[in-house]
């Protein structure tokens, strides 16, 4: 596992938890996040970057103390990007690993070849367009792609482990099955093209609400170029009702009335620390299963509901 590198694209509360778990397990991390620091992650829950450090209060306090001491060195310049801010903390977390590579370019400026060199790419807060591009580049090289986000008390992950991923199912103590492949397999781009009306299963007569909420965020971002928030909550509510009604499997009020939809819009960027920690632990375990080839992986959606504490899988497939 030590030879596998995991690339984190756009740090979030949940991806920082995944990073922490895997780095402590001895799996190298690289970060691709050229967003401005600290504004891009001002509200992100993270033990890596304490609020005082992100607000600049820590630096200001250090500078004031330094001014009192004659000949004291000047304070360090604040990192310009999220990647550069995270790097020293990741290195400190596990000094035995070979550093932490960073890429400070904006995601849209990073070539496909860069993503293809990592065993697993874990991404958050991406547009569907960029997620499809990165997933294709990663999986085409024989690697794995995971898109994961949390929103309020819920979280959702979409996993593309590739058509050739092999694993052995656990059959009992110290006993594994013959080599198996994921079946059915659906590429990430095709997952995004599955209509809402086809997102049903034996125990799900209608699309799961956690998944529907996440897809509504991605749908709104694809249409407007912006993530839902309090400022555009009314527009999100209108567009989401239309999107739901067009599915013809649920009504426009499936996720709630106008006020509920406006509240859902305000949660798109709201990351809750315990939710990030739990889902981050689950995804970290999925990464280890993917790397080792031991145990059956999730195929191809994971949903977490913080109200009941349940995390379950769901299969997106063509019908």
Regions found by a protein language model. Give the residues of each.
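Adenine nucleotide-associated cytosolic modules
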Residues: 1-319
């Amino acid at each position: 596992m030590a030879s596998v590198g995991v690339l984190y694209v756009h740090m979030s509360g949940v991806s920082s938890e995944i990073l922490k778990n895997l780095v402590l397990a001895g799996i190298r991390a690289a970060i691709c996040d050229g967003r401005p620091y600290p504004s891009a992650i001002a509200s992100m829950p993270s033990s890596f970057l304490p609020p005082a450090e992100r607000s600049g209060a820590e630096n200001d306090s250090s500078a004031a103390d330094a001014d009192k001491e004659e000949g004291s060195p000047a304070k360090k310049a604040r990192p310009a990007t999220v990647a550069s801010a995270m790097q020293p903390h990741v290195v400190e977390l596990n000094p035995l690993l070979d550093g932490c590579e960073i890429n400070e370019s904006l995601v849209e400026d990073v070539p496909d070849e860069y993503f293809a060199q990592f065993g697993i790419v874990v991404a958050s807060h991406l547009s569907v367009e960029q997620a499809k591009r990165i997933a294709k580049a990663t999986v085409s090289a024989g690697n794995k792609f995971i898109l994961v986000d949390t929103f309020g008390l819920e979280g959702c992950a979409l996993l593309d482990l590739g058509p050739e991923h092999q694993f052995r199912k656990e059959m009992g103590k110290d006993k594994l099955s013959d080599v198996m492949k994921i079946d059915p397999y659906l590429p990430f781009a095709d997952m995004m093209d599955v209509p809402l009306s086809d997102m049903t299963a034996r125990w799900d007569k209608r699309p799961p609400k956690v998944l529907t909420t996440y897809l509504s965020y991605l749908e709104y971002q694809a249409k407007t170029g912006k993530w839902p928030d309090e400022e555009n909550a009314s527009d999100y509510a209108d567009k989401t009702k239309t999107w739901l009604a067009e599915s013809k499997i649920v009504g426009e009020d499936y996720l709630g009335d106008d006020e509920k939809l406006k509240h859902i819009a305000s949660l798109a960027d709201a990351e809750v620390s315990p939710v990030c920690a739990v889902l981050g632990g689950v995804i970290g375990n999925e990464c280890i299963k993917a790397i080792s080839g031991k145990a059956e992986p999730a195929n191809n959606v994971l949903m977490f509901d913080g109200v009941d504490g349940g995390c379950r899988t769901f299969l997106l497939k063509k019908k």
